[in-house]
Structures are given as structure tokens and as C-alpha cells.
Regions:
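Conserved N-terminal Rossmann-fold NAD(P) cofactor-binding segment
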Residues: 24, 36-45, 49
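Residue-level detector of anion-binding/catalytic polar loops
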Residues: 28, 78, 153
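A structural signal for short hydrophobic beta-strand segments in well-ordered beta-sheet cores
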Residues: 35-38, 83, 89, 173
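Rossmann-like dinucleotide-binding cores of NAD(P)H-dependent redox enzymes
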Residues: 1-37, 121, 141-149
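Well-ordered beta-strand scaffold positions
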Residues: 34, 51-52, 94, 152
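Mid-to-C-terminal Rossmann-like scaffold of FAD/NAD(P)H-dependent oxidoreductases
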Residues: 102-173
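FAD-site-proximal beta/loop scaffold in flavoenzymes
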Residues: 42-47, 53-127
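Short secondary-structure boundary/capping segments
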Residues: 19, 51, 88-89, 146
């Protein structure tokens, strides 16, 4: 767990500003811990990995995602951080395609990757459909990520990783 919200994705200055947006809006963030359990009483009780119990009106947990690949594995498909596909989004079975959050695909900028975001899922789903219909156009879309929090919008292209060189551009009113 990151000690600051978005600390492993954003450069330190941007992560600090992002966390401040939540704090300024009255959101109490608990970072650097994992949730070990949540119980419902009159309010929610959240137990953290260090034994601290928090009471809350509501709980929002950012847990990340692990692709569920059992069906692909049972079908004998290659699985490595998702279902492995080629540039046409075909698996190693030529009658099966995969797209979206579960697909591990070759990207010209990022290398072989799997992306969990609506932009990639939408573009990849359309490309897989075209490929199934006979198109011989490879999937070449490099994904973008975006979000809007408390009136502040951010966008990123490529990998979100705080260790990478990042360019930040602020757009005024």
C-alpha cells in the first residue's frame, strides 16, 4: 500500500496534490495500510492490517484487480498476467479472441501489457469485433487513462508509474 494516495502511479508532487483534493473535500483517507476485514454494525467497522479498527459511515476500498482466467486456462489458452493475445487480439486458439481488462497484448509503446481502463476496454472490444469479422488491421491503440476528482481532471497516456519520467501540464481556466 502506498503511503500517499496514488504514490506508486504519480510523481510525488502530483500524488500530494491529488491526496489534498480528498482532504480538502472532507474525506478521511487512511493510506499505507491494508484492510483485513469490514463488518456492518450501525456503521461500518473496518479492521486494518495493524489491528486498528475504524468506524465509518461509508467505505470505499481501492483494491486493484486480478484477472479471472480460469475459463481461459481450462480452454488451454496461454495465460500470463491475463489472457495472452496477438496484435489481432486472437489467443493461441485461432477461434478465440480476448479484449479488455483481461487481455495481455503487444503495445508498440508499452511492450506486452494489460490495461484496466474503460478507454482500452472500449477500443479493444471494437478492434476484437472487427478482427472476428475478418479485418486484418492490428490493434495499435496506446491506452489513455483519465479521471475527474472534485472538479480536477487528469489524463495520462502510457504507463502510470511514479518511477518513470513524467511531464505535467496544467491547463488554466
Amino acid at each position: 500500500p502506498d503511503p500517499i494516495l496514488g504514490g506508486s502511479q504519480f510523481p510525488a508532487q502530483i500524488a500530494s496534490e491529488y491526496q489534498k483534493l480528498f482532504a480538502d473535500a472532507g474525506v478521511h483517507l487512511v493510506t499505507g495500510h491494508r484492510v483485513s476485514s469490514v463488518r456492518k454494525h450501525e456503521n461500518a467497522e473496518v479492521a486494518l492490517d495493524d489491528g486498528i479498527i475504524l468506524e465509518a459511515d461509508d467505505v470505499v476500498a481501492g483494491l486493484g484487480a486480478t484477472p479471472v482466467t480460469n475459463l481461459a486456462e481450462d480452454a488451454g489458452l496461454t495465460v500470463d498476467n491475463g489472457v495472452v493475445v496477438d496484435e489481432y487480439l486472437r489467443t493461441d486458439d485461432p477461434a478465440i479472441w480476448a479484449a479488455g481488462d483481461i487481455a495481455n497484448y503487444p503495445d508498440s509503446v508499452l511492450g506486452r501489457t494489460r490495461v484496466e481502463h474503460v478507454d482500452n476496454a472500449t477500443m479493444m472490444g471494437k478492434a476484437a469485433g472487427r478482427s472476428m469479422a475478418g479485418s486484418d488491421t492490428p490493434y495499435t491503440h496506446t491506452p489513455m487513462m483519465y479521471s475527474q476528482v472534485f472538479g480536477v481532471r487528469w489524463e495520462a497516456v502510457g504507463a502510470l508509474d511514479a518511477s518513470l519520467q513524467t511531464t505535467s501540464v496544467e491547463v488554466g481556466d
